[in-house]
Amino acid sequence: MAHVVRIAYKTIYNCIEQGVLDIGVADLPDHGIRRRRAKETRGTFSHGRSIEDRPAEVIDRHTSGHFEADTVLSGKRKGQAIATFVERKSRLIIVKRLQGRDSTSMTKAILELANQLEDNLKPLTVDHGKEFANYKLIEEQARIPLYFAHAYSPHERGSNENRNRVLRRFIPKGQPIEEITDDELIQINWYLNSRPLKCLNWRTPIEIFLRNLRH
């Protein structure tokens, strides 16, 4: 009987870099996808609830309303950014413009989302970027817990990372967010949610999300 051995992405990359495996990074199926960040440029902090403490209903995707959140930046050090919120069950993505890359801008976006979705917004899974530093205020005012992924582990927020990669087809790195109009953001957001996905049995995120709202 065969046994399945699970190996972390980091272990594979370390073995390649050390020459233990006779292959290169380019030989990997997803070699164009970075599994770890070379350097975190946004600033970080180390507090908050661990992703390991998330309840089972968040992990198994059987319950709607659980979101992953992230920030999409341009190539500039300052200026606007985009907040992305991805619902884990339906893969629905909600895109919001941020006037800055700071915690105040992200806090405003999350509280706005909480006001819009009301009881349909449940725990958020995020990273330790400085834009989430106001997590205590968010938890208090939005009445939802925030769970933080481990450092340099974007795969722990895989739904968000995947949707962000598709978003980058429309907003490539280096393009100032200020150049994108509100109408263009709406159109991009609608396209992403209207596109059938294999993981949804070729249904669309908006279809699944709205169906869950009715039940």
What annotation goes with each model-predicted range?
Residues 1:
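Short alpha-helical "recognition helix" segments of helix-turn-helix
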Residues 4-60:
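Basic, flexible linker segments flanking DNA-binding modules
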Residues 72-94:
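Short conserved beta-strand segments at catalytic cores or DNA/RNA-binding microdomains
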Residues 139-146, 150-215:
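Charged alpha-helix within mobile-element recombinases
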